Regions:
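Short acidic-glycine-tyrosine-enriched beta hairpin
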Residues: 30-34, 74-93
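Single-pass membrane-anchoring alpha-helices
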Residues: 2-20
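Histidine-centered metal-chelating micro-motifs
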Residues: 45-49, 84-99
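Ligand-binding loop in jelly-roll beta-barrel domains
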Residues: 92-115
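A short glycine-rich, His/Asp/Glu-containing loop-to-beta-strand
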Residues: 24-49, 53-59, 112
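Short histidine-centered beta-strand/loop micro-motifs
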Residues: 40, 48-53, 70-71, 79-80, ...
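Glycine- and acidic-residue-biased ligand/ion/polar-headgroup-sensing regions
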Residues: 54-73
């Protein structure tokens, strides 16, 4: 019985380690020469790394969410909240700051990149 419990605990711990190391999940829903549509899922507490936007893009929030934005210029952290159905625009070449999901469940977005 002890061996079974220890095996279950070790398996659970390994699962948590694997899940913790996974970056935001991306699933390309549609792509052609003009556009790419991707569903992105952000796990609680997981940062999305900073980057430069390669294309103009529209982001549609599929879930209510709360996230921390780390300003790349000043290092200032701000909390932002979005509602399901909110839509935002970003220009090509913009600095995409580090974002961290502050909620207790994953949230999803649809990113429409114009090529």
């Amino acid at each position: 019985m002890k061996k079974l419990i220890l095996t279950a605990l070790a398996s659970s711990a390994l699962t948590l380690l694997v899940v913790k190391a996974v970056p935001p999940a991306n699933a390309v829903k549609f792509e052609n020469a003009k556009v790419q549509v991707t569903e992105v899922t952000y796990a609680p507490g997981e940062p999305r790394p900073r980057g430069i936007r390669q294309h103009d893009q529209v982001i549609v929030f599929l879930d209510d969410c709360r996230y921390e934005r780390l300003d790349p210029q000043t290092g200032q952290k701000t909390i932002r909240e979005r509602k399901s159905g909110d839509v935002i625009w970003h220009d090509k070449g913009e600095d995409a700051p580090q974002l961290t999901n502050q909620g207790n469940k994953p949230y999803r977005t649809i990113v429409v990149e114009l090529k």
